[in-house]
Regions:
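Positively charged n-region of N-terminal signal peptides that target proteins for export
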Residues: 1-4
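Mid-length scaffold segments of soluble, non-membrane domains
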Residues: 81-146
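Hydrophobic/aromatic-rich core segments of domains that either
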Residues: 135-199
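Bacterial N-terminal signal peptides
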Residues: 7-17
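Acidic/histidine-rich, surface-exposed loop or edge segments in extracytoplasmic proteins
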Residues: 47-79, 105-116
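Boundary at the C-terminal end of the N-terminal hydrophobic targeting segment
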Residues: 21-23
Length: 203
């Protein structure tokens, strides 16, 4: 099994999330936070920062049909598939939000300045949830041009940038990696899907 970078968050004294990265297998990554990997029938949604709260959401035939419809335009090319993935991610956020209590999720939630973490998501939550969605798409055989990778991180205190994590896809034709980052957008909006090397240079 391939190695990947997994991120765990703890709440700091000021309420900000502090991210630590370590190389783990996919199984180890989910086990490290006592989280079951997604299946086509069930996904556990992380929220309230650092996956402090987990809400199981059942998925059925109707959900599978919706995802299939959303990914259908992506069959044409890798670029089209990335656009379709973004549309699926926005739908997924709206699908699980009412059950997880995250319908008022804001963009770039930090927990600083007294900001409540209830119903919000930090980058650990969004990167893990996005990775779970991507794995579901893979399990449903809806990804033709990409494979799912583990989350990647950028930034740490010493380089002056706050830690941040994102879900990742690899274009199977070119090997180019792409960030799928929903933390930068509020509830129900499409995530950024940009080259991972570009994402890593951002702050």
């Amino acid at each position: 099994m391939s190695r990947y970078t997994v991120f765990m968050c703890v709440l700091g004294a000021l309420g900000a999330s502090v991210c630590d990265a370590s190389a783990l297998t996919l199984d180890e990554a989910y086990a490290s936070v006592s989280l079951s990997p997604p299946t086509t029938r069930m996904v556990i949604v992380c929220h309230d920062f650092g996956c402090a709260q987990r809400t199981p959401v059942g998925l059925g035939a109707g959900d599978h049909a919706t995802l299939s419809s959303l990914l259908a335009p992506g069959r044409a090319s890798a670029e089209a598939e990335r656009k379709a993935v973004a549309a699926a991610a926005a739908w997924f956020d709206r699908r699980v939000g009412p059950e997880a209590g995250t319908t008022r999720r804001v963009a770039r939630a930090t927990g600083l300045g007294g900001q409540s973490t209830v119903g919000q998501m930090d980058c650990i939550d969004t990167s893990r949830n996005s990775t779970s969605l991507l794995l579901i798409l893979e399990q449903l055989h809806l990804l033709r041009h990409h494979k799912v990778e583990g989350p990647e991180a950028r930034g740490f205190v010493l380089d002056g940038r706050g830690p941040h994590a994102t879900a990742v896809l690899t274009d199977i034709h070119t090997g180019k990696q792409w960030a799928v980052d929903s933390w930068t957008h509020k509830y129900g909006e499409r995530p950024d899907v940009i080259p991972l090397d570009v994402w890593k240079q951002q702050s």
